[in-house]
Amino acid sequence: MAGHDVQYGKHRTRRSFSRIKEVLDLPNLIEIQTDSFKAFLDHGLKEVFEDVLPISNFTDTMELEFVGYEIKEPKYTLEEARIHDASYSAPIFVTFRLINKETGEIKTQEVFFGDFPIMTEMGTFIINGGERIIVSQLVRSPGVYFNDKVDKNGKVGYGSTVIPNRGAWLELESDSKDITYTRIDRTRKIPFTTLVRALGFSGDDEIFDIFGDSELVRNTVEKDIHKNPMDSRTDEALKEIYERLRPGEPKTAESSRSLLVARFFDPRRYDLAAVGRYKINKKLNVKTRLLNQTIAEPLVDPETGEILVEAGTIMTRSVIESIESHLDGDLNKIVYIPNDAAVVTEPVVLQKFKVIAPTDPDRVVTIIGNANPDDKVRTVTPADILAEMSYFLNLAEGLGRVDDIDHLGNRRIRAVGELLANQVRLGLSRMERNVRERMSVQDNEVLTPQQIINIRPVTAAVKEFFGSSQLSQFMDQHNPLSELSHKRRLSALGPGGLTRDRAGYEVRDVHYTHYGRMCPIETPEGPNIGLINNLSSYGHLNKYGFVQTPYRKVDRETGVVTNEIVWLTADEEDEYTVAQANSRLNEDGTFAEKIVMGRHQGVNQEYPANIVDYMDVSPKQVVAVATACIPFLENDDSNRALMGANMQRQAVPLINPQAPYVGTGMEYQAAHDSGAAVIAQYDGKVTYADADKVEVRREDGSLDVYHIQKFRRSNSGTAYNQRTLVKVGDVVEKGDFIADGPSMENGEMALGQNPIVAYMTWEGYNFEDAVIMSERLVKDDVYTSVHLEEYESETRDTKLGPEEITREIPNVGEDALKDLDEMGIIRIGAEVKEGDILVGKVTPKGEKDLSAEERLLHAIFGDKSREVRDTSLRVPHGADGVVRDVKIFTRVNGDELQSGVNMLVRVYIAQKRKIKVGDKMAGRHGNKGVVSRIVPVEDMPYLPDGTPVDIMLNPLGVPSRMNIGQVMELHLGMAARTLGIHIATPVFDGASSEDLWSTVKEAGMDSDAKTILYDGRTGEPFDNRVSVGVMYMIKLHHMVDDKLHARSVGPYSTVTQQPLGGKAQFGGQRFGEMEVWALEAYGASNVLQEILTYKSDDINGRLKAYEAITKGKPIPKPGVPESFRVLVKELQSLGLDMRVLDEDDQEVELRDLDEGMDEDVIHVDDLEKAREKAAQEAKAAFEAEEAEKATKAEATEEAAEQE
């Protein structure tokens, strides 16, 4: 027998084919969320308060200090927050101290600082009743970056930028004439020596002394001449900088000094953050810059005078390690004193070394280090600026190297805690202005912290972040895997990140540093590809937000691969050679081969075993959780694997799911950590268990009660249902499953089912990836899922009186009310169809809502009582089902409702959806298709033992897609079904072909793993042998019920009067430009005319056509489309006198905006007016006629007389 048995939890054993022993268990998969939020509550929030406070008033007589804060118990429990549409948050109280410096009086007071959303154990937040996730953001790390660029003449120039966490950028660049310039905050450039002079080193000789002699320095000094002898060089430099930063303002040296201090050296305006300081010290440190260079002068210990390194020595890693303590100490430290006019007058400490230029052995190059300022220094220092300039000048001499901004050593992750801290900081800095003004305006004697603090800006900032930030997302709750993936997602988008349009190919591409940190496979298809990534399975954040991955340390002396685990970030890993996890080892832990496959700085090749420093801990450390759930991933093309990983996240939870026969061993861990299952918090013994709760008695006698969720609606409208797994008397340990969540079986993730699949064509029904399915899957509810939809109705106060929820609905028969209770609300358990009333509701009717007849009746009988119209909540199209639950919220019961709302009723309708033609199915290898035909069981092909096949797939879907993993899974699945076992074949360490064939043989299958199939309709065998086996197939969330849609009479767009589009708007089908071309090509003029008029936006035409159809008359000619009129009016509004003429050059009258709206409807008053008007018109016409007759008579008389 190939493989060995492995136990997953207490309920499942799998035969595993892995050969590599795992030395490290997977970490908790949602720790990126939970650890970050915990760190925020423990110290992040405190740091933010300490950053902004203390606040002094303008005269510096009063000061507000921060003392501490306390988070109290949440107002609602998790469940209550969900039900009441509230947020799961806890009140936070902050203690402040207000000090009056004149009198010495101190007032300490605790101030309520708003409700702060609290993370649940599952790593989510509940905001306004909806479960949300804060996605971690991938951003460029603060620090100093060097880049190279080639100009049009092929000359290489360099550039450098200091990027802070917040504050002004400082850039260096060289031009084609080899002059070096600096830019401050993206303004115009100035020679870099100008900035050096402003820092207090004004003489040319001083500049050469600091940087050494080089062509770039010489050219720049020549360019930077002393223009105004009245000013000192430093003052002149300061004025020149001020002119660049504030053009047009009067420039003085003093204002320039204060401006530069504010821009770079004031911790409130400029912040590198801990990570920026770490990155700058790492980049500008002399240790890394001296590596492999030849030293040009002896290095002497300043205390003892002992020569540590002779001149001419090559500084290898071992040499540098031997003098590391001296390099970190005072070796070659030089103190420069700036002149008195400088921006910062403190002495500048630099570390200075001379090395032989790599390009020219006769030249000596100066290297300047920043002497490692302390971690507490969060602004840039003059030493940093000078060291950056030195590094920049060294690049031209062939020392140092440029940075790759897509390297994960230069990109870091802002997780929840940091994103929240930034929001609070934003709110506090807005509050600070407010506080300062109130301190200055009000009387000092009576002020208390409570009076001067307005918490509105802080709570608003936090609320806005959770409610509407791009990174605060509605949780993807299709199934446990999609929840887990969402929590581990890394987005490069969002505030302070990239935008889709600007992100180029390089940012999106897979980088060699992604190995073990970010998954190279799981990313969306489409515009976000490569911008949204997933953390790899072992990935972990360090304190600076860089992703680390674990490696086993190799002992260089003995060559033994130890079990000591070292976590490395991407830039640390660059210094070492790492062997792959599948390198063969001897019993004693040494490498079995002299040459092993390994990686060094992104180069994958064979390395001698004796130079390897580390080894991967596991083959699956490369990929994310969803990708690690694909068996035989190593046999799939990466594009299809990407689809497979993404589609597993869209699986719909089924009624009775099955774990896959062929898994990867990842199913248990994914289900355990997803947060969808109920997990034991402590050891104990089960004392009570039913479908709704489980009670566990701990060793110390205390009782834990676990509540089981039944058929709750998830964010994506599926049923979130948990099933108890334990019985009374069971002993549970901490971390054991107490109940399965949705899409789980026996503590393992179970997204789909294990049907018998045959690769064969059948009557052409599986053309283009379509899926043919047996009716058994419908009858036995194999792919049936439950969906819950929520509908709500609220009563408001209107101008004409309050709306009411009632059974008394006008013009509705008793039959429609049969399932409503005495209040007019549907009973739980009622079966409802489209159009049925869920909540009976009436709204008072205004006078203007009444028809002419009703007004007449009111005028005669004075009956005002039934002036209501029916505004009941009815079942929308396609939402038939069973009423699962009804929730009623009223002000009387103390529920918080929006203003103006008196009562809110929510009705939940459950639907059982069986699989049907048009639903989308998929395997785990990116093999997706739509169900094209459901065939009766008796017509399906059957195996020699009489078992009918469940699903038929097209064999042509395999070769061109290159996802051969599905075929391996098929054969192994059949063997597993025959043997009655479950199998684990971990990614990159799974079953080999030998394992596969030996298992097939063990199961007694034929040697080619194919079989004879018989046609179910005729009983004849098919000509060729067919591959039949068990493949794990899932039903995806794209169901035909949600997509099928037809419009009859529906809404029109206001401006163009064309039908709306889309199912949600009950819209029509767009007949676009190309479709019009098709009709034109066929010469179908009448069809074309009616599509562009009646069926679209000819308002009068469509009314008349409707009337004609209903009355059975011929349809009249169409009129002018509304959108044409809109175009004419638009052109007229631009001042073009545009008119429409007919063939006789007569102007065609276009309908005016106010015409033609309500021509048939007429009110009683208008009727009276119309009658009067008609009478007057008739009278006037009569009089005119009489007058005409009289004139005619006169005319005839006159004519007679003349004769």
Curated annotation (Swiss-Prot):
Query: Which residue ranges are recorded for the region named Disordered?
Result: 1174-1203
Biological processes, Gene Ontology terms: DNA-templated transcription
Residue stretches of biased makeup (Basic and acidic residues): 1174-1195
* EC top class, as a word: transferase
The Gene Ontology CC terms held by the record are: DNA-directed RNA polymerase complex
GO function terms (MF aspect): DNA binding; DNA-directed RNA polymerase activity; ribonucleoside binding
Q: Which Pfam families match?
A: RNA_pol_Rpb2_1, RNA_pol_Rpb2_2, RNA_pol_Rpb2_3, RNA_pol_Rpb2_45, RNA_pol_Rpb2_6, RNA_pol_Rpb2_7
Instruction: Give me the reactions it catalyses.
Output: RNA(n) + a ribonucleoside 5'-triphosphate = RNA(n+1) + diphosphate
Please state the Enzyme Commission number of this protein: 2.7.7.6
PROSITE patterns, alphabetized = RNA_POL_BETA (PS01166)
Q: Which UniProt keywords apply?
A: DNA-directed RNA polymerase, Nucleotidyltransferase, Transcription, Transferase
Which PANTHER family does the annotation name?
A: DNA-DIRECTED RNA POLYMERASE I SUBUNIT 2
Q: What do we know about how this protein assembles, alone or with others?
A: The RNAP catalytic core consists of 2 alpha, 1 beta, 1 beta' and 1 omega subunit. When a sigma factor is associated with the core the holoenzyme is formed, which can initiate transcription.
The family assignment reads: Belongs to the RNA polymerase beta chain family.
What does the UniProt function comment say about this protein?
A: DNA-dependent RNA polymerase catalyzes the transcription of DNA into RNA using the four ribonucleoside triphosphates as substrates.
Name of the protein in its database record: DNA-directed RNA polymerase subunit beta
Q: Which species is the source of this protein?
A: Streptococcus pneumoniae (strain ATCC 700669 / Spain 23F-1)
